[in-house]
Regions:
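Beta1-alpha1 glycine-rich phosphate/pyrophosphate-binding loop at the start
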Residues: 1-73, 165-191
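FAD-binding core/adjacent interface of flavoenzyme oxidoreductases
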Residues: 1-4, 24, 60, 64-151
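Glycine-rich Rossmann-fold phosphate-binding loop(s) that bind the pyrophosphate
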Residues: 7-11, 132-133, 155-158
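Conserved beta-strand termini and adjacent loop/short-helix elements that scaffold enzyme active sites
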Residues: 31, 77-79, 131, 157, ...
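Short, conserved glycine- and acidic-residue-centered signature motifs
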Residues: 121, 130-133, 161, 189, ...
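Active-site-proximal cofactor/substrate-binding loop regions of enzyme domains
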Residues: 151-152, 186, 192, 199
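Mid-domain beta-loop-alpha active-site segment that forms a flexible
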Residues: 159-165
Length: 200
């Protein structure tokens, strides 16, 4: 019995670990297109705020630990390109462009979310970044250090945007925030939102 999981982020690895605990003889394979698994994504803004900390401090468990200690076949750098439910197979491609097909008895899709980027001119220019994965966190931290960044603009006012604003201010980087909606912090109670706005 082969349990195949597409996506090695929090949901995918939790499912893989739980499946092995309940059925130790189950063959569990996880396909992750990035090089990173099992890291504290919520800690990225706080890590970026501290220039003395390595972004690698956020890694909770390396891929080889899942293989050696839990018997989970975790393959990184492999992207699923198509699924054929009729024959229960997933076609993939690795970073070198090599194709490979995986068979499954049960398939779980856990690819995670992708950041929304507005369709505006210049969105693909150097220095325009998103924060979703550990690779994004690495790139942001490296860019700040390499270019001695002193001013940034953040599009959005969700939780991560606000945490990044605070993190950048900790590093003495000026921040302008652009809100896509007319109301300030629409997901927050109005009186509290006004208090946050007054103190910002």
């Amino acid at each position: 019995m082969n349990f195949l999981i597409i996506g090695g982020d929090a949901a995918g690895m939790s499912a893989a670990s739980r499946a092995k605990r309940h059925q130790p003889d189950l063959d569990v394979t996880v396909l992750e297109k990035t090089a990173d698994v099992s890291y504290s994504a919520c800690g990225m803004p706080y890590n970026i705020a501290d220039p003395d900390r390595s972004i690698e401090d956020l890694v909770v468990r390396r891929a080889e630990v899942f293989r050696q200690k839990q018997g989970i076949d975790l393959l990184t750098g492999i992207e699923a390109t198509s699924i054929d439910p009729a024959v229960k197979s997933v076609n993939t491609r690795d970073a070198d462009g090599q194709a490979r097909t995986f068979r499954y008895d049960t398939l779980l899709m856990a690819p995670g979310a992708a950041p929304l980027t507005p369709a505006i001119p210049g969105i693909d220019l150097p220095g325009v970044m998103v924060l979703k994965s550990l690779a994004h966190g690495r790139a942001i931290k490296q860019f700040i250090d390499q270019w001695a960044v002193r001013k940034t603009v953040i599009i959005g006012m969700g939780y991560i945007a606000l945490e990044m604003c605070e993190a950048l201010r900790e590093r003495s980087i000026a921040v302008d925030m652009v809100k896509p909606r007319e109301t300030f912090l629409p997901w927050m109670e109005a009186r509290l939102a006004e208090q946050v706005k007054a103190e910002a």
